[in-house]
Amino acid sequence: MADMAPTLVTMEPCSGAHQIAEQIQELGHEVMMISGRHVQAWVKDHCNGQKTDLNDAFAILNLAYDRWLTPIRGKTREECRLLALQASYRQLKGQRTKTMVHVKATLHAWGFPIRAGSFNQKVLHELIDANREAFGDEVAETLHLMINRVRDLDHDIATVLKLLTEATQRDPRASLLRSIPGFGVLPTSRWCAVVGDIARFDSPKQTMAFIGLVPNNRITGHHTETSSGREARGQGKMSKRGDKMLRSLCILGAASLCLMVRNDRLPDCPFVASIKERLASSRPWFKVLVYVAAKLVRIATALLKYGETFSYEKAGISKAVLKQWELEQAKAA
């Protein structure tokens, strides 16, 4: 390929696809990655579902000319590093949770229930030593080993989180995202690794749709009103498309923000007032979280687009009112 003229290379994502795409781009070619879901659908419609290498290649060739198709964005080497650190963090957290559950379940089976949320390692070691005769030496030593494993996992998790923080800080977008209340290291690093250049989204709503925080539309043209008399425009539950981890982290960030608002730990502003209004309404808790998470995504999109840090005075104000406010501030100066 090094001797070929610059051309378009289409491919399905595979193991190491982003590194392969980066090497092809270094040779001067353009890379287009097409989701296997689209290839499978094309083969099913045009080749009677007969999956062969030739049919897959023919599908990729035809899908490359589909101007409505959204290809998979190739990730940079730095974004792949962030994804690797995040995967290691989740793996260690999962091991820690499973180990804690195993220790608690074993103690509970022997008649020593441990309350939820409690895992004092010193107390557990003393409990096992005090009842060594009941447990037996083999079970007691195994429980000590498992508790020490939780301690080692805590150290490893803290180390990986520190490395993830250092890697995230190298991204110029991190300082802008970290200024948003509710955006910590994990959602910021996931955003930097998954979303990519914010300029590829025409509006904040497209960013919300990319993450999966918009209603799922199912419009047929029938039944414009529900049984309660409210007009229904075909909007159902949350679409849940896109990256699941980023969506979950945005909702968790919204939960922490709602708790800060409920405890009056944030200054009074239109942004906080809108959240208080939602919390005071009769809407379910999770619907309020999705609303706040979507608002955080819109704010993050605006900050990255204009290169500004978060401001409580500007958040929650429409663009027209904000423009008028900026003009008044300029005249006063």
What are these regions (language model features)?
Residues 1-8:
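Short, basic/hydrophobic alpha-helical segments
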Residues 25, 32-72, 123-131, 224-241:
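Short alpha-helix plus adjacent loop in nuclease-associated cores
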Residues 218, 222-223, 230-231, 264, ...:
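Low-complexity, acidic/Ser/Thr- and charged residue-rich accessory regions of DNA metabolism proteins
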Residues 175-179, 185, 191-281, 285:
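Phosphate-backbone recognition surface of nucleic-acid-processing proteins
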Residues 10-20:
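Acidic, metal-coordinating catalytic cores used for nucleic-acid/nucleotide bond scission
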Residues 86-176, 317-320:
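Glycine-rich, often acidic, oxyanion-interacting loops/wings at catalytic, nucleic-acid
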Residues 67-71, 99-100, 157-158, 196-200, ...:
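Short helix-capping/linker segments at secondary-structure and domain boundaries
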